[in-house]
């Protein structure tokens, strides 16, 4: 099984390759069922506050 911290770090690194440098905050959250959502934006937020203009991606479950 994957280590969650390593997986979240990998997601953040991948998202960073797509981020505008001004989008300083890169975040990743586990969203249940082993799925993860990562995004970059100017300020941190909870997953439910992610806005349409955030760069984001949902990864399928890995568990």
From Swiss-Prot:
Name any cofactors this protein relies on: Zn(2+)
Peptidase M12B domain span: 1-33
Name of the protein in its database record: Snake venom metalloproteinase basparin-A
Q: In which tissues is it expressed?
A: Expressed by the venom gland.
Q: Which SUPFAM superfamilies match?
A: Metalloproteases ('zincins'), catalytic domain
Tell me a Gene Ontology molecular-function term this record carries.
peptidase activator activity
Instruction: Give the note.
Output: Negative results: does not degrade components of the extracellular matrix. Does not induce local tissue alterations, such as hemorrhage, myonecrosis, and edema, in mice. Does not induce systemic hemorrhage, thrombocytopenia nor prolongation of the bleeding time following intravenous administration.
Activity control, as annotated, is:
Clotting activity on human plasma is not abrogated by the plasma proteinase inhibitors alpha(2) macroglobulin and murinoglobulin.
């Amino acid at each position: 099984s994957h280590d969650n911290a390593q997986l979240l770090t990998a997601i953040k690194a991948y998202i960073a390759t797509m981020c505008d440098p001004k989008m300083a905050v890169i975040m990743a959250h586990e969203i249940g069922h082993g799925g993860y959502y990562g995004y970059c934006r100017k300020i941190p937020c909870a997953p439910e506050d992610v806005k349409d203009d955030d760069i984001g991606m949902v990864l399928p479950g890995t568990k």
